[in-house]
Design a protein with these regions (language model features):
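Hydrophobic/aromatic-enriched cytosolic interaction surfaces used to assemble or bind macromolecules
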Residues: 1-321
């Protein structure tokens, strides 16, 4: 069911991205038809160890310092937003793909079916989880759903820091999904298969897309088994063997200006895939009100928050999920 537009709560205009290295926030105005404009932005560095992404351990080890960083961002904004959309690191959640030949008509039945599927390989108790899902690819084998599962208390650590700074997190999403949102907003004609590699100080995430749909996602922490080269190779094999892929139309890399060993990461990806890669450029999706020339590392830091802010501006315009 879709609510009449006048009865809907307006989505947050501000998106904030919390990473192990910084807090970045943007406020976006505009529309898909008229174009999007960043009217405010701010980035506040974080000291090492304040945020440590983890699936099963505390993520925010020094909450007072994270709260202060958020307050500093609002000071640079010139005002404190009451509600924000929040981007958290990929490492705090598990992303799964489930497929059903027949999708239940009732949302409550679909909820239960997805929870039942997750119990088979859940990294923690379902009762302790915060779960969200959205429609993915639809094929002759059925309807696929992209499911995100995280411990409720760990997501709560990020939400609590926002609340303590004076801003309520009205929505929470993962970093790489919103880097992809920025890519799609900058090139809405994307139809073919493309690969996104999101390199961060704490690891890397790879996502295969078919047009706007996520077909594969894998995150590996920097202390996990194997390096980026192995992850790229495994992803390429999955693409060929399981997805029947015939080749990526584009390979895009984000995070390369901020991550340790960024140039090495680019060479690794190009060597493994045998083709050149492109940098994600969120400037294709938005303009900036101050018309300044932004350094690449700043643009890189703002990418995920730009992606989520745009997604919020367009929420509800493409039909219900």
């Amino acid at each position: 069911m879709r609510l009449p537009r006048l009865l809907r709560t307006p989505p947050p205009a501000v998106a904030v991205d919390i990473t192990p290295r910084h807090v970045a926030a943007v406020e976006v105005s505009g529309s898909r038809a008229g174009g999007f404009l960043v009217i405010r932005y701010a980035v506040q560095p974080l000291a090492t160890g304040i945020v440590v992404p983890s699936l099963n351990a505390s993520n925010v080890t020094r909450p007072e310092e994270l709260t202060q960083a958020l307050r500093s961002v609002w000071e640079r904004f010139g005002h404190r937003p009451r509600r924000v959309a929040l981007v958290v690191p990929d490492g705090v959640a598990k992303v799964s793909f489930v497929r059903f030949q027949q999708v239940p008509a009732r949302v409550s039945d679909l909820d239960e079916l997805i929870r039942f599927q997750l119990k088979k390989a859940a990294p923690f108790r379902i009762e302790e989880s915060q779960i969200s899902y959205s429609k993915g690819l639809e094929t002759v084998e059925g309807q696929q759903f992209v499911v995100v599962q995280a411990r409720r208390d760990l997501i709560g650590e990020y939400e609590t820091a926002c609340q303590a700074s004076g801003a309520t997190a009205g929505l929470v999403d993962l970093a790489t999904f919103n880097v992809a949102n920025a890519v799609i907003a900058g090139d809405p004609t994307l139809r073919d298969d493309w690969l996104l590699v999101h390199v961060t100080p704490g690891g890397a995430a790879l996502a295969i897309h078919r047009g706007r749909d996520v077909a594969f996602f894998r995150h590996r922490a920097s202390d996990g088994d194997g390096g980026l080269g192995d992850l790229v190779h495994q992803t390429a094999m999955f693409y060929q063997d399981r997805l029947g892929g015939s080749g990526f139309s584009r390979v895009l890399v984000a995070g390369g200006t901020r991550a340790d060993g960024a140039q090495t990461a680019r060479v690794t990806i190009e060597t493994r895939l045998g083709r050149a890669v492109e940098d994600v450029d969120p400037m294709k999706a938005v303009g900036f009100a101050d018309r300044s020339s932004l350094p690449p590392d700043l643009v890189d830091a703002l990418t995920a928050s730009i992606g989520l802010a745009i997604a919020q501006r367009t929420a509800g315009t493409d039909g219900d999920v």
